Amino acid sequence: DHIIPLQIKNSQDSQIISFFKADKGSVSRQVHPPWPVPCKSKLQEQDSSESKESKAEQVKINNCVVQNAMLYIENNYFNDINIDTVAFSVGVSRSYLVKQFKLATNKTINNRIIEVRIEQAKKVLLKKSVTETAYEVGFNNSNYFATVFKKRTNYTPKQFKRTFSS
């Protein structure tokens, strides 16, 4: 497999880099690079000689970490991701990310990963089988997917499909 940059855009305010994994001449799922997307904050622009930061500025940094983590989850839910891969992708330690994520969202990272997968599954399930949906949204086991789906939506995947398919 080779990683091929497809789009690179730089500006003062943003940096977008898209990568795709190429497998035998075909382009497959998007793979996001394992480094944080730069967040613009006043603190990052301050002179590094300043020794103290206000609480509000510290929160901006932490929110930036959480924003990057959420972005990574939303863009990679279909992959085999966990707390460690999310922490690595945003460039912080596991324990730091867990603490900041919980403070900012009042949710765990695993809870957010499952939440995103279930929301995507609701869309996919209307067009594909339960097993195909499970694997497409990042579950490695269709029975576990069905259990989690039922717990989160109060519908089994088949009930959901019957109820909401047009």
From Swiss-Prot:
MF-aspect GO terms: DNA-binding transcription factor activity; sequence-specific DNA binding
Alphabetical list of Pfam families matching this protein: HTH_18
Transcription regulation in keyword set: yes
Compositionally biased residues, Basic and acidic residues: 42-55
Keywords, sorted A to Z: DNA-binding, Transcription, Transcription regulation
Region (Disordered), start-end ranges: 28-55
Recorded superkingdom: Bacteria
The UniProt record lists the keyword Transcription regulation: yes
Feature: DNA-binding region: 84-105, 130-153
HTH araC/xylS-type domain residues: 67-163
Name the record gives this protein: Uncharacterized HTH-type transcriptional regulator in cgkA 5'region
